[in-house]
């Protein structure tokens, strides 16, 4: 059995969870998330917690045990607190701004790159170089942050590009001169 899957998911007072077969719906103060879980796992709601158990002793069932528990935990945390990822834009002339809901990034190309957020995701820009992606679904927030970073990933020589705020760029030495 999974060590992560063994611990039950605690449900706060302001969150309601509806289990309908393999579909789990979590409603909270920030919104509602719905997810279809993989087969091979059973869910039981007891008072203010959800217990996840593998339905069989087969390998695929044990594999999904911890995954489902973590997905439910992420859904509960998303509808209560939400998730956010911060990115930094490094480089001369590189900047970002929000026009309406669209994020416009000038990252050294001949044209600005425009990104429209999916439902439930918001972009916020502070001081033209710091972008915050926030929402209630952890997976979508991470994917959107990765898409923004992929516009101009940081390069190892000067560190220019778009990077996560807590990311360390491994720097390389330049060419050594002729001796």
UniProtKB/Swiss-Prot annotation:
Keyword tags: Ribonucleoprotein, Ribosomal protein, RNA-binding, rRNA-binding
Extract one GO BP annotation from the record: cytoplasmic translation
Q: Name any one Pfam family assigned in the record.
A: Ribosomal_L6
Record-level GO cellular component terms? cytosolic large ribosomal subunit
Q: Name one GO molecular function term.
A: rRNA binding
Top-rank taxon, per record: Bacteria
SUPFAM superfamilies in UniProt: Ribosomal protein L6 (SSF56053)
| Translocase keyword on record | no
Q: What does this protein do?
A: This protein binds to the 23S rRNA, and is important in its secondary structure. It is located near the subunit interface in the base of the L7/L12 stalk, and near the tRNA binding site of the peptidyltransferase center.
Family, according to the entry, reads as follows: Belongs to the universal ribosomal protein uL6 family.
The cross-references to PANTHER family, in alphabetical order and at most eight, read: 60S/50S RIBOSOMAL PROTEIN L6/L9, LARGE RIBOSOMAL SUBUNIT PROTEIN UL6M
Subunit (UniProt): Part of the 50S ribosomal subunit.
Q: What is this protein called?
A: Large ribosomal subunit protein uL6
Q: Which organism is it from?
A: Prochlorococcus marinus (strain MIT 9515)
């Amino acid at each position: 059995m999974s060590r992560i899957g063994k611990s039950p998911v605690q449900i706060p007072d302001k969150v309601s969870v509806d289990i309908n077969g393999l579909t789990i719906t979590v409603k909270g103060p920030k919104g509602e998330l719905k997810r279809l879980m993989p087969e091979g796992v059973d869910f039981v709601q007891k008072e203010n917690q959800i217990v996840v158990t593998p339905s069989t002793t087969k390998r695929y069932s044990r594999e999904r045990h911890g995954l489902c528990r973590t997905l439910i935990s992420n859904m509960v945390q998303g509808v209560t607190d939400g998730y956010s990822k911060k990115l930094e834009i490094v480089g001369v002339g590189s900047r970002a701004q929000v026009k309406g809901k669209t994020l416009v990034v000038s990252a050294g190309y001949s044209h600005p790159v425009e990104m429209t957020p999916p439902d439930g995701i918001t972009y916020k820009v502070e001081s033209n170089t710091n972008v915050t992606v926030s929402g209630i679904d952890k997976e979508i927030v991470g994917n959107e942050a990765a898409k923004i970073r992929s516009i101009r990933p940081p390069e190892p020589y000067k560190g220019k590009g778009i990077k996560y705020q807590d990311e360390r760029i491994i720097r390389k030495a330049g060419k050594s001169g002729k001796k």
